[in-house]
Amino acid sequence: MTKKNIGVLLVCCCMVASTIGILTNSAGVFFTSVADSFGVGRGSVSLTLTISNMAYAVGGLFTVKWIRNANFKKTVLLFSCIYGISTAALGICPDVFFMYVLSVIRGFSTGVIGMVLVTILINNHFTSNVGLATSIALGFSGIAGAILSPVFTSLIQSTGWRMSYVCIGILSFVLYLPCILSPV
């Protein structure tokens, strides 16, 4: 592996940590706090994850089109901003319905800059060890979920779920900075 390959792999690890690690694998830590705050069942809040994942799948269908028709960096910048802002905006939702709407937006945006884009980057930069590189990058979804879930739980306990969503929105965007700023 060359230095450039390692750099691309690190970028992909950050991208997967942001999209799958934060969007999906650590989402459950919010369910009880949000449900109690809104006076609804946890199932109503967990539906946000289902909606996000469905929108993620749809967004992934548009990845190649956007990357082909637009500048790569601008696409990543645009959709990582949308993802970060929509995640932070979950903290100001007055009820669960608005969380559903934001879940569509954040799911779609991460779909565009998520798994499909990561595999495209790996396939474009690696001529050998493609499977290994893909496995390492995708492994960061679980690593991020395992590390961030207790961190987010602690954050929710200390600052409340609303402020935690703002912090997570910022983190979601920050994890995309290596992709935006590096010469990938």
Description of each model-found segment:
Residues G7-L47, G59-T63, L148-S149:
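Extracytoplasmic
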Residues V16, S80, G84-T87, L102-S103, ...:
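A generic transmembrane-helix signature of 12-TM secondary carrier transporters
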Residues A17, S86, F97-I113:
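Hydrophobic core of transmembrane alpha-helices in multi-pass small-molecule transporters
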Residues S52-A57, G142-A144:
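Short hydrophobic/small-residue motifs within alpha-helical transmembrane segments
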Residues V58-F97:
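Conserved MFS/SLC helix-loop-helix module at the cytosolic interface between two early adjacent transmembrane helices
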Residues S103-G139:
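Cytoplasmic helix-loop-helix junction between adjacent transmembrane helices
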Residues I136-V184:
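Helix-loop-helix hairpin linking two adjacent transmembrane segments in secondary transporters
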